[in-house]
């Protein structure tokens, strides 16, 4: 089941919420667990067993890690065992074919293998459960003794499919006791509508524009930049839209999840961009990989190693393809370049120039991200810089600029905080007008969903 479907919005969600608000508080965790299983099993009837296994295994290993607190050696062995099992499941389903194809490419031997579908949300709930185990090992949190409470954390439907990667430490008390009321429900519903509109009205239309541009075998320089601008906006509104919907659903259920995006396209450096984009994933790699490796408290060479390792892994987390690894290393190199060379210069130039620099780096980065075929990747990058391009600008570019101008302009404006700050002021001064705007956005989104084909969330495949 997905958030941007008529069935979820008009069948599952209202029925579930009605029951959730009517049952006694002590039964809400049970209902949330069962509802999450139904939500997941609707699209993954077999792989729901895998998610249950992950919940049971990590619940048990969490209690074992706490039990062995005073036996450092055994506790460490159990942690390593937990990591191996969690990553083995992830590697088997997500990287199995990739590894065999890579080995075959190196050895020249074709290794036949069945194609495995990737369980929805596997990367997200694996990292979520690992963070729980790491925090127990680091004595940041106590193991949850009630399986149902842990299972709710592990399987909760708002963030199961595509994040955010919510830490147990952030919602530990809310899992046991949380406040639900009309005010919080309203805030959550508003966030959900905002995310739905981002996805359906902006991201899906930007996807059409980008796909149309990429369908041309020959492009001008301007066309290629226009295309990657559309993809840049699509990816942001698609993923931040999902995050808004997930956080909104959490509010409606009584939970307060941390924000996952903080207007990344206004950043004045690549480093700042990654403090604002997919915050839950970035903080996960920082806390559980980068810092344990020594972070920046080591020699310069080791510091460089740490950054490159973290970003290669970040790229690989996004997909079983070498273009994602290349994308991660690309960002690792830019972060190193900023830290050791560019930082002092970026402080001296106007912030708007820094933002342009950052967006150019990010847009080029999204080319690596979007093209899994190295031939297509090289061709697109070359076209952006005039290699193999059909001139600087042509009729095709002017056509897409004309047809996509309003969409791109709205997208660029909505990437900035100003429209949302204005809306918050409107809520305070004219709440009825704010409600009407939300209803219009909701109606437009539903109309678009009814009359157009379904487009999945991009990050659901990661």
Predicted regions and their residues:
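Membrane-embedded transmembrane alpha-helical bundles that form the catalytic cores
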Residues: 1-461
């Amino acid at each position: 089941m997905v958030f941007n479907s008529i069935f979820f919005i008009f069948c599952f969600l209202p029925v579930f919420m009605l029951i959730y608000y009517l049952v006694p508080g002590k039964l809400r965790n049970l209902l949330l667990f069962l509802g999450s299983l139904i939500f997941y099993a609707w699209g993954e009837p077999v792989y729901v067993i895998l998610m249950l296994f992950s919940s049971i295994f990590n619940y048990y290993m969490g209690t074992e890690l706490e039990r062995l607190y005073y036996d450092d050696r055994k506790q460490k062995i159990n942690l390593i065992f937990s990591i191996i099992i969690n990553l083995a499941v992830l590697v088997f389903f997500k990287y199995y074919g990739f590894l065999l194809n890579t080995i075959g490419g190196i050895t020249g031997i074709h290794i036949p293998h069945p194609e495995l579908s990737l369980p929805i949300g596997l990367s997200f709930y694996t990292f979520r459960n690992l963070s729980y185990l790491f925090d127990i090992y680091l004595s940041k949190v106590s193991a949850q003794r009630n399986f149902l409470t842990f299972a709710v954390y592990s399987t909760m439907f708002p963030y199961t499919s595509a994040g955010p990667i919510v830490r147990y430490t952030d919602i530990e008390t809310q899992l046991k006791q949380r406040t639900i009321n009309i005010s919080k429900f309203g805030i959550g519903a508003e966030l959900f509508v905002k995310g739905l509109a981002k996805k359906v009205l902006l991201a899906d239309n930007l996807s059409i524009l980008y796909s149309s541009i990429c369908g041309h075998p020959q492009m001008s320089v301007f066309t290629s930049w226009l295309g990657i601008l559309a993809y840049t906006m699509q990816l942001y509104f698609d993923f931040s839209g999902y995050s808004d919907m997930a956080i909104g659903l959490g509010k409606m259920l009584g939970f307060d999840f941390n924000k996952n995006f903080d207007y990344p396209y206004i950043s004045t450096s690549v480093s700042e961009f990654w403090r604002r984009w997919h915050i839950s994933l970035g903080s996960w790699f920082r806390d559980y990989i980068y810092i344990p490796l020594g972070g920046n408290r080591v020699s310069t060479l080791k510091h460089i190693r740490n950054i490159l390792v973290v970003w290669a892994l970040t790229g690989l987390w996004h997909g079983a393809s070498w273009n994602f690894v290349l994308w991660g290393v690309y960002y690792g190199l830019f972060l190193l370049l900023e830290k050791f060379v560019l930082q002092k210069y970026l402080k001296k130039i106007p912030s708007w120039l820094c933002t342009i620099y950052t967006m150019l780096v990010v847009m080029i980065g999204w080319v690596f991200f979007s093209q899994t075929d190295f031939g297509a990747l090289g061709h697109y990058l070359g076209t952006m810089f005039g290699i193999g391009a059909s001139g600087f600008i042509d009729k095709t570019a002017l056509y897409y600029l004309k047809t996509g101008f309003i969409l791109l302009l709205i997208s660029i404006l909505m990437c900035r905080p100003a429209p949302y700050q204005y809306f918050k002021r409107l809520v305070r001064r004219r709440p009825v007008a704010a409600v009407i705007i939300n209803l219009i956005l909701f109606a437009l989104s539903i109309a678009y969903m009814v009359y157009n084909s379904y487009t999945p969330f991009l990050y659901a495949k990661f």
